[in-house]
Regions:
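Subset of outer-membrane beta-barrel
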Residues: 2-127
């Protein structure tokens, strides 16, 4: 996608949104760290993001690593709520969470040809 984005992402967050944006960072930008927390659906779901990006020894190349977590926490477990006689025992109520993790490795490169830079990048995601 190169620079074909509505809102340009050329920082550590580019690993998820547009990996080619990592190539816009210069070696002088050094190591970048980023973190984000967002609550979805009125606080029911939690979205967390942690990443870092660093330049390689070759100019114009950049690596990025990201961890994404989406979870729904404190889900009531009502399987043991009822006793054998049919009465309700709230002491048997417990909670659990449902969580998905994704790990991303990103690589970006910038090539300067003729009229301006050409940036490309890609990510490998493991869920």
């Amino acid at each position: 996608m190169g620079n074909a984005v509505i809102a340009s992402t050329n920082d550590v967050y580019a690993g998820v949104w547009n990996p080619a944006g990592l190539a816009a960072l210069t070696p002088d930008d050094g190591l970048q760290l980023g973190a984000m927390h967002s609550e979805w659906f009125g606080g029911v779901g939690n979205y967390d993001y942690l990443s870092f990006s660093l330049p390689t020894t070759q100019g114009g190349n950049r690596l990025g690593f990201s961890l994404v977590r989406f979870g729904i926490d404190q889900i009531p477990n009502t399987l043991s709520l009822y006793e054998s006689d049919g009465s309700i025992n709230f002491d048997n109520l417990s909670e659990f969470s449902s969580v998905d993790y994704a790990f991303l490795g990103s690589y970006a490169k910038e090539i300067n040809k003729g009229k301006g830079p050409i940036r490309f990048g890609g990510s490998v995601k493991v869920v």
